[in-house]
Regions:
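Catalytic machinery of carbohydrate-active enzymes
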Residues: 1-334
């Protein structure tokens, strides 16, 4: 049996699909299982033990400078032809808009995404397996954990850079300061004050600072270089290590070196959950019931205003204090 899963949206969405991939492999151990993803999110599948093959296409909006839309479309058409020649028995469409790809590859059977179901994204993905006789959600069985593996060579490179970085004994806090949605953004001043508080109080030994790289006004990939620089300047003299993540593999590896993580709802939050980290997560107008960190200790911060900027620094510090007893020491050894 040849099964193709189609997941063509964002990083966190793909991470939330990994328990469904594990369930497929568990119940169909001899099947060939492939997945079609986009170039933006593909690296989170590095080393995934449940997949035989990963097929990557590039969205036109993510094309490199000098690359035309026609070239992107031609490459995608060639990929669809390759998959069609595989003779796909079953396509599982795990995200909206993916059904046309299932038709293009000529899948003999298609299980479609059903948007609008009131469940966590992990449970919604696993519910797609119900037609195959796998009552994972809703049902008596709970979906398993997320699956995410950092690339060892990237982890080692970051550890070497970290070895010469001063810091006090104690847990390592990963802080990710970026979010695509305006309602999910916390001010640079608030991040800086929180970092100063947890370091000066001795609660935290070191801080790893993460952000989306690039200029704020970049037309395709707006980033937070200026915001990160402002936070670092406000925390000068403190053990705050900037972690530049030009590739998704670097974000995964960097977060793997933290003991607990503070961030807004988004891809970094789901990556941290996939790495087993306790998480304090700030939610704006997204529903935590659908998107909270899966399978790890976490504290959700959300105000009645449904904007992250309304969350106070003392509230954030209290949540970190609450999770500290559950923090490991993943990052404490270089």
């Amino acid at each position: 049996m040849k099964i193709l899963v189609i997941r063509r949206d964002n990083i966190g969405d793909l991470v939330c699909t990994t328990p469904m991939l594990s369930a497929l492999r568990q119940h169909f151990p001899q099947a060939w299982i492939g997945i079609l993803v986009n170039a933006y999110n593909a690296e989170v599948l590095y080393g995934n033990p449940d997949l035989d093959e990963v097929f990557v296409y590039r969205k036109a909006k993510h094309r490199a400078a000098g690359s035309s839309k026609w070239r992107i479309w031609l490459e995608t058409a060639r990929l669809m032809l390759r998959l069609r020649r595989r003779g796909i028995d079953l396509a599982i469409v795990a995200s909206p808009g993916g059904e046309r790809y299932a038709r293009m590859v000529g899948a003999r059977r298609i299980i479609r995404d059903k948007p609008g179901q009131p469940a966590h994204e992990v449970e919604r993905c696993c519910a797609l397996l119900a037609p195959l006789g796998l009552p994972l959600a809703p049902g008596p069985l709970t979906p398993g954990p997320l699956t995410l593996r950092p690339q060892p060579r990237v982890v080692q490179r970051l550890q070497l850079a970290w070895a010469a970085f001063p810091g006090a004994p104690g847990p390592v806090l990963g802080v990710h300061v970026s979010s695509r949605k305006a309602t999910q953004r916390w001010p640079a001043e608030a991040f800086a004050e929180l970092i100063r508080r947890v370091l000066e109080s001795g609660q935290i030994g070191r801080v790893l600072l993460f952000w989306s790289p690039g200029a704020a006004h970049h037309p395709l990939h707006p980033g937070d270089d200026e915001k990160a620089a402002a936070i670092l300047a406000a925390c000068a003299g403190l053990p705050v290590l900037p972690v530049v993540t030009g590739a998704l593999a670097e974000l995964v590896a960097g977060l793997s070196l933290a003991d607990l993580v503070f961030c807004s709802d988004g891809g970094a939050m789901h990556i941290a959950a996939g790495l087993g980290k306790p998480i304090v997560c700030m939610f704006g107008d997204s529903p935590p019931a659908q998107w909270h960190p899966w399978g790890v200790p976490h504290v959700v911060l959300q105000t009645p205003a449904r904007v992250v900027s309304a969350i106070t620094v003392p509230e954030a510090q209290q949540a970190i204090t609450q999770l500290l007893p559950l923090a490991g020491r993943a990052g404490s050894q270089p």
